[in-house]
Amino acid sequence: MKDNNTDYQNDNSCNNSNISLSMAVISVIATLLPIIIGLALWNKLPDELPVHWGIKGNVDRLATKAEGIFIMPCLCAIIQIGVLIKLYIDPRKEQIHHKPVLVSIWIVPLITILINVLIYIIALGGKVSMTMAVFFIIGVMFIGIGNYMPKLKQNYTIGIKVPWTLNSEENWNMTHRMAGKLYVVAGVISIIIALLNNVLSDEVTIIIFMVVFLVTGIGSVAYSFWLYKVKG
């Protein structure tokens, strides 16, 4: 007879293959992929590339072509290496469900590729709202994270890592169920902001964005602390 507990543990664990050297190297190379794309487009790209936008999508900072192509991917690659090291040295990495691990490994490369491709499209004259795109990407990302939050097991890398969650499995589980809901709501609101970006004023957009994401972050920690005080 098949052991259901064993199956559950295998399904919800992160073995070394999930953070293998080959996957780590591929993810870092993927983060640097925009450099290759930029070099391929070098002769077509203008001498200056847009690298920063205001709330309404107006370009408010330009960089040289070389800066625009190299700086962001290189910085993101450094961040990606830090993420990989943190995942690898986590003493509780065996407890992390493999899907959240994959999300953690690939979120930086995917965002880097998306943002840089959008920069190239805009630089080449494409009519794309970077603000709308960023809010939409953040929204999808938060909805994805929110769906995986309740499945996270205790670890030191992914999730709400405060003393109360790390010291109590019950606190961890309840906190991440609540955080999952908050993240999904925040993601939906971010997508709505993206769709209404041309309607909302700059001030309203900033206020809604800040309130939603502060409530998501602080609310998750506050709920964890409340559980600690109530349940010990």
Per-range role (PLM):
Residues 40-45, 77-89, 144-160, 223-230:
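Membrane-water interface of transmembrane alpha-helices
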Residues 31, 154-231:
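Terminal transmembrane helical module of multi-pass membrane proteins
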